[in-house]
Structures are given as C-alpha cells and as structure tokens.
Amino acid sequence: MESKQLHSIIGIWTNACRFLLAAVFIFSGFVKAVDPLGTQYKIQDYLEVFGWAASVPAFLPFLASVLQAMVEFCLGVYLLFGIRRRMTTLFVVLIMGVMTPLTLWLALSNPISDCGCFGDAVTLTNWETFGKNVLLLIAAVSVFKWGNRITPLVTKRFDWLVAMYTFLYISGMTLYCYRELPVFDFRPYHIGADIRKGMEIPEGEKPTVYETRFILQKDGVEKEFTLENYPDSTWTFVDSKTMVKEQGYEPSIHDFSIIRQEDGEDITDEVLDDDNYTFLLVAHQLSQADDSTIDLINELYDYSVEYGYQFYCLTSSPDSDIEDWQERTGAEYPFCLMDDITLKTMIRSNPGLMLLKNGVVINKWSVNSLPDEYVLTDRLEKLPLAQINEKTFSHKVVLVLAWFVFPLLFFSMVDVIWEHFHRKKKLKENRTK
C-alpha cells in the first residue's frame, strides 16, 4: 500500500515539476524570441563583464540570443507534451546546472543588476534569480530522475509534428521580430507611453542624480565636459557617458536627454512639450546603421518640413560618423546626441523611427517598415498611423496564441481521434479471431 502511495506521490510531484519547468522555459524563450536584439545586448553585457567582448566576433552575440530563445522555448514545449523525455530532461538539467552557479556568482558580485532571464517582461534582482534557479534545478533533477513518470500528451506517432511546428513557430517569431519590431514591447518607450510620466518621481522620494559627460576632441587632444561647461563648435564630439552621482529612486525612464549636436543645447523639454507631431530617427551607431532606406528617410524629412513637423536624428555617434553619414546619404535633418543605452531601449532597430506628440509615443517603425509616400498622403492629423491603436496589444495576444495554440490543439485532437480508431480497429480484429 505504501509503495503504491509513494508511486502516486512521485508521479504527481514529477508532473508538477514538469509543468512548472515547461511554463518557465516557454515564457523565458518566448520573451527572448520577441526581442532578439535585447537579448543580444544583454549577452554583450556579460561578455564585457568577463572581458571577452573584444575577442568575440560581432555576429556571435546575436546568434547566441536566437539559439537561446529557440532552445528554451522548444524544451518548454517538449516538456509540456512529454516529447523525447530522456533527452529533453537531460538538456534541462544541464542548462540549470550551468545557470544556477552563474546566478549565484552574479548575486554575490553584482556586476549586472538584472540577469535578463525574462527579458524586459519581468525584472528580477540577482538574488531573486538565484532563488528561482535553485527551485528550477530541484525540479529539473526530479524530472530527469523520474522521467518515465511524465505522462505524454501526444503519442510518438504525432510528437514529431508538435516538435517540428514548435521549432518553425519560434524560428519565424524570432526572425519576424528581428526584421520588424518586437511583437510585445515591454520597455518604457512602448506605443502609448507618456515619456514625461515615465520620468516622474513620486512625492517624497529622492531622485537619483546623474551626470552626463561628453568626450570631445580638438587639435588631437581629448577632454571631458559636462552640460555646464560644454565648449564651442570648434571641438569635435567623440563619445558620451552617463554616470550615477548619487543613487536614489529610479523611474522607468531616467536618462532621456536630447542634446543638439550643433551647439550642445539641451532641447529635451522642447521636444517633449511640443503639441505638434515630432519625428525621431533613432540610430544609436551611425557606422553600423542600415543605409538601404536613405532615400525614404530623406523623403520623410521633406514631408515633415512640408507640413511643419519637427524631425531629429538621435545618435550617440561621434562627429566623424555623423559627417560621414551626411556625405553618404545627403541628410539635411538636424542631429542630436543621446545616451547609447537609451537609444537601444527606445527602439530595436538601427535606424528606427519614432513619432511623438506631447511627449507620448504615437507610433514606431523599424527600418524595414518605414511609412512611404503611399501612406503619407495627407497631414498626420488625418492619417490612422498618427493615432494610437488601443486594440493593438489585445489583438496581438489573440493572434500569437491562435498561431501557436490552435495548431497544437489540432495535432492533439487528431492524435486522440487516430488513437481511438486504431484501438477500436484492433479490438474488432481481436474479436474476429
């Protein structure tokens, strides 16, 4: 009797661990897949911490981000359906066996404040991440040890279909979000976000004090300057960095500062208080920016001039790169300087386009989906693209679930029906013998 009870308890425990791991891996893989560039930036942060950034090829962090998202998502689905139980549970144990001590080191040394395990969707402290990984490691060891107790949701006749569709789905999702923009934007600059409100500090809270330093060059000599002592135009911009002088309450948007390249003037308030539309061309590094749509970008600038809208290019590039971009593209729009990390956070495209009004993000486009003359047929006030679509998020949720859940449900139903008729046929054959 006791052995039967123990057998039942182990089965319940194993499947509970299986569903927990499946949920975490599916969610973790999905949020990485919808923001592959964000995962790439986090991997680059790790490489810099370990001192490997200079020795790693530029393409490798992005490749690693794509593979990480696909592996986590696929393992989660395979656990959920009980596919290739031995191999799947082995990979899960190996991953957790590596990540748990790594996050312990992160918690102790704190070189990075957020491990990035759930992208920008859920932010955990390093100690919270370590605690989560200890729990998942226990669950992983359990499903590996008692993998034969995992109840498959599909038979071996159809599990390859589920496995293949899962791989194709997450591959397509990753590539789409890389070419366009993340399907779900968990960052503070999402469509509909009020940048002013994101910068607000609750009453009674002490704000974090930041200092932006600009590295400029003249006659071969580099010097650091602040906004208070920014020099004249005879100095050439090289780089900028934002540092914390005094830690305090940190709002979701804490380093949004637009500095006009021409004279070093801070025009942040001017941009955020503008009750007209403002185009922001965001290119964190012009030397790496995609210049395949330069004609369309110039047409967008001409459109903004024609209808009286402001147009700025925000970048963290040095003056030499800005001049090179102007020569190559014929750009006539004004350039402004901004923190590199902020630019990467604003939009996952280099370059990308953001439309503001009264400091609210109205719309965003990647370099591959910029509005053209066939869309910009009139003033923005009369066009749908200049209105916030309130239904966007809910529609995306339904669409994403429909493309993933419904096909898997269909495969499962076909499998059940097939198995039912197969057993019925076999039973009938046995009766006739």
What are the residue ranges of the model-derived segments?
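Membrane-embedded alpha-helical segments of integral membrane proteins
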Residues: G97-I150
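Internal/C-terminal transmembrane anchor helices
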Residues: V154-V183
